[in-house]
Amino acid sequence: MAKGFKVKSKAPAQKVPEWDYELAKALIKGKKIVFCLPGRGVSYTYLKNFVQLCFDIVQAGGGIQISQDYSSMVNFARCKCLGANVLRGPDQLPWDGKLEYDWQLWIDSDIVFDTAKFYQLILNSIPAEAITKQEVTEPIKDANGVAITDKDGKYVTKVVGHNIKIDDSKVRPIVSGWYCTEDGRTTSVAHWLDEEDFSSNGGVMNHETLDTIQKRKKPFTVDYAGFGWLLIQKGVFEDKKMPYPWFAPKMQVFESGNVQDMCGEDVSFCLDAKEAGYEIWCDPRIRVGHEKTRVI
């Protein structure tokens, strides 16, 4: 090596964490989450994951409620999870307005999840652009407990925390993760098609596939999201534009009238939500498992 030269290795740049879980914990502190759990049986895998999630939310300072119910009619099972009563009419509120909550977390009985996936939903619902952090400071004190001042007589301070302010106009009231269906290729989120494309697509919606969704890097809007792993902010079901029954199956009739399709209960909800002005956001990074039984 020539004289006068010295080789210095450059320290590798530190990778910024993909998710700020400490922020997510701060966002749920003092908030109430109600688990909406349709179905009548779960696996031990589900049970262990659910107990851990409950523990972690409480440890982070959040509150939890469980609303579980069952009906052979899935649309009615979901309504029952919201405490619906057919005698209260179309303008009724979830749980008759008597249950305080900030978010509903819908989890189907065959979903495999963990606490990280929940925090990721929170960070999708309250994105970075909706958050303003304000530093909280306090004077630095000497060994005798006396506040230290600088040469101008001003207190020397240190940052001890942050106050978080949220711009509600930038919050996403309906957010979802995704999971594969039984074919192992089709996902639980989809986009609507016009009649011609719907027909050429074999009479099914334009579902994101395992290949297409893994090419996405940022949250995106969808026309439909399955309710297996879905977070809904308070105010959506309370909206006067979202009357009961919230999951009533619909007949989707295309323009010509020659093609029509019966929608499932979750598709019907998404149709109503979009008509009421809500966007449905999916983050392609939030993938949960989907437990299915296979005979071999």
Which functions belong to the PLM regions below?
Residues 2-72:
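N-proximal low-complexity "stem/linker" segments adjacent to membrane-targeting elements
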Residues 39, 57, 65, 99, ...:
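Cationic, hydrophobic amphipathic alpha-helical membrane-interacting segments
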Residues 49-52, 80, 120-121, 268:
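Alpha-helical elements of Rossmann-like donor-binding domains used by nucleotide-donor carbohydrate transfer enzymes
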Residues 74-97, 119, 271:
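Short, conserved alpha-helix that lines the donor NDP-sugar binding/gating region
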Residues 92-114:
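Short beta-strand-to-loop acidic/aromatic patch adjacent to the donor-nucleotide binding site
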Residues 99-101, 170-172, 278:
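Short, high-confidence coil segments that cap the C-terminus of an alpha-helix
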Residues 114-251:
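Conserved catalytic core of nucleotide-sugar-dependent glycosyltransferases
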Residues 246, 253-263, 267-290, 296:
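Catalytic donor-sugar/metal-binding loop of nucleotide-sugar-dependent glycosyltransferases
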